[in-house]
Amino acid sequence: MRPIWTGSISFGLVNIPVKMFSGVNPREGLDLDMLHKADHAPIRYARICRKDGEEVPWDDIVKGYEYREGDYVVLTQKDFDKANPRKTETVDITQFCDAPEIDLRYFEKPYYLEPVKGGDKAYGLLREALHESGKIAIVSFVIHEREHLGALVPLGRALILNQLRYPTDLRSGDNLKLPTTSDVTKRELEVALKLIKQETRPFIAEDYHDTYTEELEEIIKAKAKGHKLTVKSAKPHSTTPTDLMATLKASLSAKE
């Protein structure tokens, strides 16, 4: 793996040199191309200059901020680095807390942190301290020209930096029309709890994979051979309030 960032973890006055690696693989899906409907020729996207109508190569493209209509300030990598030199080079620990305090909606993307030569002992100390305390570290860091919030957690021998969303990144559900619990009977709740208990087991991520893509690949293979496919509608029927108890009981029986 190639590091996507090199800097240090700031733990009090201790600076731990680290490299950052992506903790996720690119999602493997079908590589679908955009085609012209008339002749099935691939569509090509181009970077066109609005002024002269010419295509612009990547080497001639820069980033800019429109501070007034039609007027731009061009920004270079040096400008991004100057904005806050410390934050561009540091994963700054701002506090510690218990993991359940963080709303699961905030978690966005994991990264691995690996100690650079000379940082092994301090890295190991922070990792063991987090293990022993049961706490996680809340951090701030800058990557891809943007400051992020993060949660630093130990996982085995590694330190994982989970990128977090800011509260302003989340939408409120206050305007949703949500039911109250007043219409739920005690008996319905008991049966629902039995179904949950019956389906409760340890979570093993390896048991899950993308079956939708696999089925879509089978459709593609069939169409490539000229086969016509007939697909039955699988739209689920909504359970009505009058059928709720009977359906819950049927679910219990089906799982036994």
Predicted regions and their residues:
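Boundary segments of small protein-protein interaction reader/adaptor domains
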Residues: 1-256
